[in-house]
Structures are given as C-alpha cells and as structure tokens.
C-alpha cells in the first residue's frame, strides 16, 4: 500500500504477493494433485499456486465449505487429490487475498488455470526493497522508479498473458 505524506511516497513495509494465473486456456489436467501448507511471507520466491491456495483456505473462517467446493470441482474432472494434514502454515496478512480465494472457487476455469497452468505462480516478496525486477510487484500496472522519482510502467506486468490478484499490506 502506498501512502502520500508530505508529498513523499511511503509504504507500510510488509509482504507483497502477486498471484499470476495464465490466461492461456490450453492446459493439461493431471490425474492427481497434492496440496501442502507452507509459510508465505516476506521472502522473494515463486511458489506453488495449489499450496498457496490451500494454505489460504485453511486459515479462513469457512474452510470446510471452501475445501468442499475445491474437492467438487476436482471430482468433476476426475482429478484425485491429497491434502497434507495441517500442522502449520500461513500467508502473511492472508485475509488480504480473500478476493482471490472467492474468485477461483467461483470460477471453475480460473481455478483450473490457477492450479494447472504451466505459467501460473505466486510471486512473494516485500516492499522494503522496491526494485523494478521484483516479481512480487508484477500485478501492479505501475512501479515506483527511485531514479526518476515517479511511477512508471511496470515492465513485468503482462495483462495479455495473466489474470492477476494482488495481496499487499
């Protein structure tokens, strides 16, 4: 989140995640999928979309309903699934990604592209090091250019190739 105070951009220094779902509908559905939980916070990484979604669901208030929706869609496509028993795992400020969870569970095509699209992934990172090449910002159309002291077009934002969801805070 960017705020302007006294004419200067400031951030609240937290995790930033760009959820990138390939738009190409040419995907191969597997016979099975494995879901595990993990810790998704400030680290710069490209992480597994299925396990990111599963971790978000397990940390939500109505996890049983959401898991049943997920299972029903996978059953419809004859995809077997294994869910690792929850021991630990979180998404930093995961409630900020509630719109992503709702969107994929209410749109079968979007969910399947999210889980099985070869180019789909979640880029994690943080806003403490706002460099143009940090992929955690790719869901943003613009990015702060410290050298030019202004927002510029984000070279990593490719709306023709991806549906994006942004988890800030």
Name each model-derived stretch.
Residues 1-10, 15-169:
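Long, non-globular targeting/processing and low-complexity regions
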